[in-house]
């Protein structure tokens, strides 16, 4: 019995060796190598390898669009190009999802297609409108926007000016809210083109609103409604535009009517907020209980003043007139609607971006003349006067 088992094992081992010897290998075309799988006793073909995918180049885009590589380069860099070619290239870029290597572009051209934008408060409606205008113009010229929010911190404003230059931005747009000597010097010392909005600096490109005329026309309208005991809630006079110019505009209108403009009762906000409007209105009511008109430096401040007047039993639009500046969306829905000044802030942003792009085009050549642009406004009369 034991000898039979031994014979069976020997026969199995022999058959196994014979099986391995008789494995048939089919001939393969070319130089394709077989892989022997010793566990399955078979030869297999190697797995197919996916071809390496290389990123698309300008040349690839040019071939797909049927244009020259130079035309694609001009498209990507915002250069001159016919509308027909621009449309064809844009369609190919969008279809392929092509994105140029910005680092390679910088090495090749020596230009960084990034612009720093410094803002005082990202939560402000007017700031948002200006940013929208800037972004539309920069995007059309293939520039990226780097946003820096100072939260009304003067030191942070100066630090961002330095940091953006260290990051090699092509230029800077500053949404100004003060005009301190330190800021003025820092702007003039910038190594890249700078454009300022909202403030006026000598020898720098600026885009600003006519704050003085706007405040004057707003106060004139209030005077037309028979208001004579007018008070003013203003902003910090470190700000030459909203602080000084708007207060001067109110005084101009009073002076034209023969009133004592220098004696204008006023209180100053530390921030353009409803809370500060509330505080200043309480202060002025205590000092001038006979007041019949209130002009506010911004609409948001006016909303805070409105709360106090209602609590005091003053009927806005009847017992007392109220007006703000800025055309905040909420002014349309409060009751009564708030009379205000509408500035065209998106256009401010667009014009600032155009100025900067023009400066970048002239970099390295004869400098373009410094442009300073004042934009208009509209007086929006509602029921609050």
Residue ranges with predicted function:
Residues 68, 113, 170, 228-229, ...:
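Short acidic/polar active-site loop segments enriched in Thr and Asp
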Residues 151-154, 175-180, 201, 300:
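Short beta->alpha connector loops
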Residues 104, 158-161, 184, 219, ...:
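Short hydrophobic/charged patches on amphipathic alpha-helices used for structural packing
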Residues 77-79, 121-124, 236-241:
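Short histidine/acidic/glycine/proline-rich micro-motifs that form metal-
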Residues 2-56, 95, 136-141, 189-196, ...:
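Bacterial carbohydrate/catabolite-sensing allosteric modules
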Residues 43, 47-53, 87, 98-170, ...:
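Amphipathic helical "hinge" segments at domain boundaries
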Residues 95-101, 155, 175-177, 306:
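Short gly/ser/thr-rich secondary-structure transition/capping motifs
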Residues 17-20, 24-113:
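N-terminal helix-turn-helix DNA-binding module of bacterial transcription factors
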């Amino acid at each position: 019995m034991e000898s039979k088992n031994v014979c069976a094992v020997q026969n199995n081992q022999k058959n196994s060796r014979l099986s391995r010897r008789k494995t048939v290998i089919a001939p393969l075309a070319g130089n394709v190598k077989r892989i022997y799988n010793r566990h399955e006793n078979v030869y297999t073909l190697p797995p197919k390898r996916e071809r390496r995918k290389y990123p698309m180049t300008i040349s690839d885009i040019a071939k797909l669009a049927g244009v020259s590589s130079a035309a694609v380069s001009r498209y990507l860099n915002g250069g001159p190009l016919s509308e027909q070619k621009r449309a064809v290239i844009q369609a190919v870029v969008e279809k392929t999802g092509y994105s140029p290597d910005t680092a390679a572009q910088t090495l090749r051209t020596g230009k960084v297609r990034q612009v720093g934008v410094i803002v005082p408060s990202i939560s402000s409606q007017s700031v948002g409108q200006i940013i929208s205008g800037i972004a539309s113009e920069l995007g059309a010229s293939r520039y990226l926007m780097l946003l820096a929010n100072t939260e009304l911190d003067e030191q942070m404003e100066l630090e961002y000016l330095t940091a953006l230059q260290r990051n090699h931005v092509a230029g800077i747009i500053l949404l100004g809210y003060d005009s301190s000597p330190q800021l003025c010097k820092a702007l003039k010392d910038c190594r890249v083109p700078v454009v300022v909005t909202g403030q006026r600096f000598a020898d720098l490109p600026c885009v600003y609103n006519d704050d003085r005329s706007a405040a004057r026309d707003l106060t004139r309208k209030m005077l037309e409604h028979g208001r004579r005991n007018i008070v003013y809630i203003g902003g910090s006079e470190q700000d030459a535009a909203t602080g000084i110019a708007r207060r001067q505009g109110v005084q101009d209108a009073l002076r034209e009517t023969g009133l004592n403009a220098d004696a204008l009762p006023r209180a100053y906000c530390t921030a353009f907020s409803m809370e500060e409007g509330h505080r200043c209105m309480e202060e002025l009511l205590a000092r001038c209980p006979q007041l019949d008109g209130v002009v506010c430096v911004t609409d948001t401040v006016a909303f805070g003043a409105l709360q106090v007047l209602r609590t005091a039993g003053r009927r806005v639009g009847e017992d007392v007139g109220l007006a703000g500046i800025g055309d905040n969306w909420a002014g349309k829905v409060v009751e009564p609607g708030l009379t205000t000044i509408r500035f065209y802030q998106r256009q401010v942003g667009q014009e600032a971006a155009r100025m900067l792009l023009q400066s970048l085009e002239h970099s390295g050549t004869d400098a373009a003349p410094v442009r300073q642009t004042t934009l208009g406004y509209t007086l929006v009369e509602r029921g609050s006067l």
